[in-house]
Amino acid sequence: MPVRRIALISVHTSPLAPMGGAKTGGMNVYIRELSRELGHQGISVDIFTRRSHELDPEIDSSIGENVRVIYLKAGPLLPWTPEEHYGHLSEFTAALMAFAALRNLQYDIVYSHYWLSGWVAAKLKEAWGTRFAHMYHTLGHMKKRIALNARYQPDVRIMTEMQILQSADRIIAATPAEQAQLRWLYRATRKQITVIPPGVNAGHFQKGMSAHEARESLGLKPDGHMLLFVGRIEPLKAVDTILEALHVLRERAPAMLRRLHFMIVGGDPHRGDDREMNRLQAMSVDLGIDRLVSFAGAKEQSELPRYYTAATAVIMPSDYESFGMVALEAMSSGTPVIASQVGGLQFLVRDQETGFHMPAREPISLADCIIQLLSNPGKTASMGLSASRVAKTYAWSEIARRLRRVFDEVADQALKNA
């Protein structure tokens, strides 16, 4: 039976949330762009998320045809960390079921995102009998190894992720690396998992101006070089590794720094209570590179193409990335990527072809990669062309079709077992 109506669950963050905040990133882009493409292909998609502000509407249809974002009340109207949602998941599930019952809605499949939403999808399966596919996006076991912090609840999360694995009818993994992590750390079987990467809207990131024009529009030297970081400002993104690499360059290749600028896109540089932002700003001063660094703050998706085009390279030195949407966006813009050899980045970025791999937390290695790019314009241009070509294989239209085939397979299996 072809799937025609999907309930997509994203409890803790809306696909319409402003980019660059503490809760927003690649998952928001994934849900928004996938839903838009599914709607374009004639599939009805209802995205359920928690209402966190009194100005949130009940229903927002701005993503595109056949797509609705539905805001459900569960707990106080306050912005929360992901972990703070856990105690209100039953309330969220009840609100979702009430919304569907009042409108006599039935869904062919549920597609849940992140561990909180997987908990809800499992409860809906118990109540409705509706099968569900799940995408973890990040894994608690990996976070526990790399990014444990005071607010983190690893035991609750990992236990829930294990329960989701037992209940879900299919797990969607972004990369073979995530598939391997699920099999190794969660004892998933190969049959439970289908690897389908996220996509990219290539048309959105195609160059509308030259790199010279883009840099000039950002107030930079048109004939200079710009290194770019885009993402949340949090320790596991390892922005400090980039600052340390610039300090290495200051010692090893000071002439190169005269035409170099590093721009950080993400977070709010004027928010006094952001400890990681404050630490990075102070660190740039302590290393004597603050005049080379600018903190641009978060930017909406519509603004990013100009930044990617202006960049000589995008740098992603993360400790952990399940996929790396920023890398794919940069590649679609024809910009090489220097990325740590972790998670999905090791599959997405092709070493020496679309950019460079580097060991995580090794600023000297990163500095070497930067020197190679800046001292060899021909190689940089060749990498940019290769990056653009590779990115075209990740078109959302094809990714959506692949997911639809999986959804149809899961729904057909339900009919056979009925």
Q: Model regions: which residues?
A:
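N-terminal subdomain of nucleotide-sugar transferases
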Residues: 1-69
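Short alpha-helical donor nucleotide-sugar binding micro-motif in glycosyltransferases
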Residues: 298-299, 306-311, 403
